[in-house]
């Protein structure tokens, strides 16, 4: 144990930079990222990359249509090939480009052969995970041409995990394997693939859609870096999705608990497990924009003063409900306890849940991406095998902030806005950090915009009144502007 600690201490000055697919979508983006790495990193730092642009989606479509529509599959195949080759040709010198094209075409031939096999976990993961390999190899070659000593590394060489709905990294095995590469390339920037790991059989394991952030924090925790910066196409974390809400504003500081809850609620800006690997460490986490590095950022702070204030409105239009309706003779509390133990053991907690003791009903809300896999796992529990079903076409809208559920003003405003919406149920977190509504619709854009407008205007007045310390003025504003919500 002491040896491991000593090894980690040697790498404490290291930083890790993670770049998402939107930061690597075209030639200009790759050059921009190379400049950021040159300016913001030093020898020995780690760079984790996602697949370029929409490569992962293209690979999924290629695989999908290879079995049902060969003409369409051929179009996806050609699109992937030309996109990757175009990046290589335009970013590298002729000699280096020819070499990387050979590597790419060798990979591509391998994937074409795999498409002739039955599609199982092994084949699917091997094909879909290749975007990260191409991205890391190319990024490392670009850095070399920038005069930056670099080495690309396939994360499957050291990250170990087994197939499941939420693959968990074997930290002990992974740390031991990673150590030799850190020693070997201690004076280089290591460009590492995100999203992929390997199991004991040597098969590729995917760490979940948008799992590169999770890869980054996991690798950062394994190496004991002192700071992780996640770069994307937005400046940081906003009060709402800035692509949906024009008035959303940047949050320069967010508490660890608030960020963790945002991730748990499957917000697009944070992968659901991004914060897990670093929750018990002192690693700093920051979010910045690769398109405009100096515009601003969001820092995740371990301790922030609690003020029962709203920070974020988040939504997800692709969630499902797993429903378990027990028979009259079944002991509801006993079954519910067994389900909870199962979910805890497998770390597959729902986004929200509803328990109706009278109707012996349990509803568990998950993203569409993982719902089918979790339902399959739950159906293995013998006592609920015949009682379980899946309903889709739901959405989730939530407000997040430390102690938000104890602030009656925000709660009432939230409930009032949802009074005419098809609400399936409301739920709030145990720590009172989020209030959630699950809706039987998948169109929440207008609702989110209106909620943001009202809640953050209310926040503005709330802060103004506290500054003035005038209760009369405060309640006057509430009565005149928000009489509907009180």
Predicted features, each with a name:
Residues 256-301, 306-328:
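A conserved active-site cap/scaffold subdomain adjacent to cofactor or substrate pockets
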Residues 15, 188, 226-227, 260, ...:
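Structural beta-strand/beta-sheet cores of well-ordered domains, especially the beta-sheet scaffolds
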Residues 150, 190-191, 285, 350, ...:
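Hydrophobic beta-strand scaffold residues
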Residues 298-486:
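A conserved regulatory-domain signal marking ACT and ACT-like small-molecule sensing domains
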């Amino acid at each position: 144990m002491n040896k491991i600690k000593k090894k980690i201490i040697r790498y404490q000055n290291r930083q890790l930079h993670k770049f998402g697919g939107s930061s690597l979508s075209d030639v200009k983006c790759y050059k921009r990222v190379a400049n950021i790495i040159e300016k913001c990193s030093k020898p020995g730092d780690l760079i984790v990359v996602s697949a370029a642009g929409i490569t992962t989606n293209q690979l999924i479509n290629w695989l999908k249509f290879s079995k049902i529509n060969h003409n369409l599959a051929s179009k996806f195949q050609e699109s992937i090939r030309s996109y990757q080759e175009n990046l290589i040709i335009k970013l590298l010198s002729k000699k280096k480009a020819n070499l990387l094209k050979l590597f790419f075409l060798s990979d591509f031939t391998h994937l074409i052969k795999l498409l002739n096999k039955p599609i199982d976990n092994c084949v699917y993961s091997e094909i879909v995970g290749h975007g990260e390999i191409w991205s890391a190899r190319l990024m490392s070659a670009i850095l070399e041409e920038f005069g930056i000593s670099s080495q690309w590394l396939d994360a499957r060489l050291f990250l170990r995990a087994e197939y499941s709905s939420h693959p968990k990294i074997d930290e002990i095995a992974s740390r031991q394997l990673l150590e030799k590469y850190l020693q070997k390339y201690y004076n280089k920037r290591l460009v590492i693939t995100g999203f992929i790991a390997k199991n004991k059989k040597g098969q590729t394991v995917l760490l979940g859609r948008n799992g590169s952030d999770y890869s980054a924090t996991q690798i950062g925790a394994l190496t004991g870096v002192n700071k992780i910066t996640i770069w994307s196409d937005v400046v940081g974390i906003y009060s709402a999705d800035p692509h949906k809400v024009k008035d959303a504003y940047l949050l320069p500081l967010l508490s660890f608990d608030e960020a963790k809850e945002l991730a748990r609620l499957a917000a697009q800006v944070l992968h659901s497990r991004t914060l897990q690997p670093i929750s018990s460490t002192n690693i700093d986490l920051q979010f910045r924009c690769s398109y405009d590095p100096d515009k601003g950022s969001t820092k995740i702070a371990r301790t922030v003063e609690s003020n029962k204030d709203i920070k974020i409105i988040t939504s997800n239009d692709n969630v499902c409900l797993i429903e378990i309706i027990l028979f009259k003779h079944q002991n509801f509390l006993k079954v519910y306890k067994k389900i909870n133990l199962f979910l805890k053991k497998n770390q597959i907690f729902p986004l929200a849940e509803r328990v109706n003791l009278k109707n012996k009903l349990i509803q568990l809300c998950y993203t569409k991406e993982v719902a089918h896999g979790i339902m399959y796992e739950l159906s293995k529990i013998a006592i609920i095998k015949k009682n379980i079903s899946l309903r889709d076409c739901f959405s989730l809208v939530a407000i997040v902030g430390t102690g938000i559920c104890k602030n009656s003003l925000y709660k009432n405003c939230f409930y009032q806005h949802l009074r005419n919406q098809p609400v399936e149920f409301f739920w709030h977190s145990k720590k009172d950090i989020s209030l959630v509504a699950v809706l039987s619709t998948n169109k929440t854009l207008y609702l989110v915009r209106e909620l943001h407008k009202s809640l953050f205007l209310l926040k503005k007045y709330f802060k103004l009144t506290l500054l003035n310390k005038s209760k009369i003025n405060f309640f006057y504003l509430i009565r005149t502007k928000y009489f509907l919500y009180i």
